[in-house]
């Protein structure tokens, strides 16, 4: 099942500019619906292609929502337009951050989750830039607000990031530690990060650095997995890790090994 969304994002964007998100593909649960996870693609990719990987996972109790990012000029590509959750000059936490687009995309993702049933647990995952977006959403959840100060509306139960990085890492610790509630939410949110040691697109050291930034800011429920000889792509071992990790974190009944 897929559909397009073209609407104005107001809750996460300073200027409430109109962003045209592309096709969203939904992978329906094959068993009892216990969890919904929004899965976010990498730079230049799309939601339907992500869904092909997720459909084969032995997780029958999860509904996967796979949106497509807006097409925008990307500084890293010399201004060439492609699908991107936000503009980026380099694929690391050392680069400058496109806060307006980060907030707008985070609001779009939260909106996709906001209509799920109350008894369904909610999560966000992604690959590369999608992982960066998932981690930014995790920080918004912990802080209780987007970067622009508007309230973050969704109660997240799990975050998965493959081959990604953490936007806003430099200021995260001080923000989380300034609020008891933010610290409590950060400490209780399970996060799984996986990164290939041979990744030459988002370097492994940036994955390590992001994990350290998160844990030092109070995200203590974090697991970091490294993979020898693996570059900037997913492998079956990572997907197996996701299945084994998500099952107890979300209390899933129907995991098939």
Regions found by a protein language model. Name each.
Residues 39-40, 125, 162, 194:
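Short hydrophobic segments within beta-strands
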Residues 28-30, 149-255:
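The feature captures the conserved acid-bearing segment of alpha/beta-hydrolase catalytic domains
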Residues 6, 144-152:
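Intrinsically disordered, low-complexity domain-flanking/linker segments in eukaryotic proteins
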């Amino acid at each position: 099942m897929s559909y397009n969304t073209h609407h104005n994002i107001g809750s996460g964007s300073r200027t409430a500019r109109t962003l045209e998100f592309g096709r969203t593909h939904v992978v329906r649960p094959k068993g009892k619906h216990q969890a919904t996870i929004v899965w976010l693609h990498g730079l230049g990719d799309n939601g339907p292609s992500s869904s092909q990987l997720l459909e084969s996972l032995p997780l029958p109790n999860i509904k996967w929502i796979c949106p497509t990012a807006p097409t925008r000029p990307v500084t890293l590509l010399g201004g060439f337009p492609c699908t991107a959750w936000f503009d980026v000059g380099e694929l690391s936490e050392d680069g400058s951050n496109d806060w307006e687009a980060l907030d707008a995309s985070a609001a779009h993702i939260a909106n996709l989750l906001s209509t799920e049933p109350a008894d369904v647990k909610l999560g966000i995952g992604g690959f590369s830039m999608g992982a960066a977006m998932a981690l930014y959403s995790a920080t918004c959840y912990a802080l209780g607000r987007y970067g622009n100060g508007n309230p973050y509306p969704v109660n997240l139960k799990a975050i998965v990031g493959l081959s990604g990085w953490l936007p806003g890492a430099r200021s995260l610790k001080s923000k989380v530690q300034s609020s008891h509630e933010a610290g409590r939410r950060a400490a209780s949110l399970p996060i799984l990060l996986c990164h290939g040691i041979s990744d030459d697109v988002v370097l492994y050291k940036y994955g390590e650095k992001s994990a350290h930034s998160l844990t030092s800011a109070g995200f203590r429920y974090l697991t970091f997995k490294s993979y020898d000889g693996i570059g900037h792509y997913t492998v079956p071992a990572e997907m197996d890790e996701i299945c084994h990790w998500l099952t107890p974190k979300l209390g899933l009944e129907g995991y098939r090994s």
